[in-house]
Amino acid sequence: IEKNIRLINIESIDELERVNKVALNQNKKINIGIRLNPNIDGLTIDKISTGKKTDKFGIDTDKLNELFQVLDVSKNVNLIGISCHVGSQIFNINVFAEIFQKMKANAQIFLDIGYDIKHVDLGGGLGVSYSQDQVLLSLELIKNEINKCFVNVPYKLSFEPGRYLVANAGILVTTIITIKNNGGINYLITDAGMHTLIRP
C-alpha cells in the first residue's frame, strides 16, 4: 500500500477487511483485484490443483453476496479486476473452456452490480512436457477458446503462461552420490534436492 503498486489481489473476505483498514489508516484508496475460486477441477496432480471448492485459494463464488456486502462498506478500496488460477500442468482443453466461461459469467455479475471491471486474469496452468506421455496443448486451441468466449467484452484479459515459457529452457544436471535401499526400493541419492528443482 505504501508503494502504490498497481493492485493488491485479495484472497479472502477477511483479507479485504484488513486491507481496507490499512488503506484507511494511511488515508489512501487503493486498487484491488479479487481472486475467485471457481470450483473447477484442473484434472492435474492434486498437490498443484488450486481451483476446487476445497482448495485454499480464492473466494468461493458461492460467497459473492457476502463479498459484495463487504465491498459496499470498504470505502478505501477500488475493485478493478477479478482473477482465478485452477492449477498447474493442465493438458485438457475442456478445463480452459470451463475457466473462460465461468470467469466471463463472474465478470458479468460484477459489471451488472456496477463494478468497473477493467481486467480479468484467466490464470494459467498450461502443461509442459516432463515425459513423453504428456502431450502439450496447442496454443491455437487456447486462443480459439478465448476468442469464442470473450467477444466484445469491456475489459482486458490476461493469462499467466508461467513455466510454459521457461520449463524447457534448461536442464538439471546432478551427480548420483549413492544408492539407498529402503523396503526393497532403490533410491538414488544425488547432490541436488527439492530446493534445486521443486516439483511435486
Where are these predicted regions, by residue range?
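Active-site-proximal beta-alpha core segment in soluble small-molecule metabolic enzymes
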Residues: I1-H119
